[in-house]
Curated annotation (Swiss-Prot):
PROSITE patterns linked to this entry: GNAT
Active site as annotated: 139, 180
One Pfam entry name: Acetyltransf_1
N-acetyltransferase domain boundaries: 34-239
Biological function: Displays alpha (N-terminal) acetyltransferase activity towards a range of N-terminal sequences including those starting with Met-Lys, Met-Val, Met-Ala and Met-Met. Required for normal chromosomal segregation during anaphase.
GO BP field: chromosome segregation; N-terminal peptidyl-methionine acetylation
Name of protein: N-alpha-acetyltransferase 60
Gene from which the chain derives: Naa60
Species assigned in the record: Drosophila melanogaster (Fruit fly)
């Protein structure tokens, strides 16, 4: 693995207008001839063309403008021979806002792939209420790799960069990373499960593909001490552990009391024999 390097599209020092805030906290890797860099406004046309080839989604122009210029998004590209061959787009947001937002359908065309709604209510159960009040979460909007470069670790490289970005001390408040995927997208499911994402919930008719509702999954990866809400079984295990701990403590105290009683009895007996 090569040393970590910073790659800029124009081979010039990054400017404040074309780089992401806090980009110095993101390890930008170079593996062989593949390098990672943040998107810049000049990437809009190329990224739009790639997304139209990779995904059957008709994103509005404003979406491409946002991910190539706004600091709201973590938008990272994998570059080979000056061409973008992979892309990850993610967003950090307060957990309490996850279910307050509604994402409009990307297109009215039946030939295009659109979401029926915003974040489903099932996503509200990603974190416990006590933790979620002050926690942030990372949401992966898009992760794609050019067909000719798949199975070469490009997707893992992009995801690792995001994970490293979210597990720094500055972002300890981010307790989970989650995403949505079609239940029929087996390659994506296999990829995320291999990367320690776990199935959180089933989303019936979450997607609209060519006018037909399609089911989706929510997958979650817990980081920075985050964990899912406790189930009844978790509570039972917790209290059982407390009982075992209490029983062990009682047994230890009983043993200590017995030792003290024996010592006191021995002292009394010794003193009585001495007096006689």
């Amino acid at each position: 693995m090569a040393q970590f390097t910073l790659y800029n599209k124009h081979s010039a020092p990054p400017s404040s207008e074309s780089t992401r805030v806090d980009c110095e906290h993101v390890p930008l890797c170079s593996i062989n001839d593949v390098q990672l860099r943040f998107l810049v406004p000049d990437d809009l046309t190329e990224v739009r063309q790639l997304c139209q080839e990779w995904f059957p989604i008709d994103y509005p122009l404003s979406w491409y403008e946002d991910i190539t210029s706004s600091t709201r998004f973590f938008a990272l590209a994998a570059v080979y021979n000056l061409a973008i061959i992979g892309l990850i787009v993610a967003e950090i947001k307060p957990y309490r806002n996850v279910n307050k937002e509604v994402i409009a359908n990307m297109s009215d065309s039946d030939e295009l792939y659109t979401r029926l709604s915003g974040f489903p209510m099932q996503d509200k159960g990603i974190l416990p209420d006590s933790m979620g009040r002050s926690a942030d979460v990372g949401y992966i909007l898009s992760l794609g790799v050019h067909r000719s470069h798949r199975r070469n670790g490009i997707g893992s490289l992009l995801l690792d960069a995001l994970m490293n970005h979210l597990t720094t001390a500055e972002r300890h408040s981010v307790k989970a990373i989650f995403l949505h995927t079609l239940t029929t997208n087996q390659p994506a499911i296999f990829f995320y499960e291999k990367r320690r994402f776990t199935l959180h919930s089933f989303l019936p008719y979450y997607y609209n593909i060519r006018g037909k509702g399609k089911d989706g999954f929510t997958y979650v990866n817990y980081i920075n001490g985050g964990h899912p809400p406790w189930t009844l079984l978790d509570h039972i295990k917790h209290y059982a552990s407390m009982v075992r701990h209490t029983s062990s403590l009682c047994a230890w105290l009983a043993g200590r009391v017995q030792q003290v009683v024996r010592w006191f009895y021995h002292k009394l007996l010794t003193r009585f024999n001495f007096i006689e």
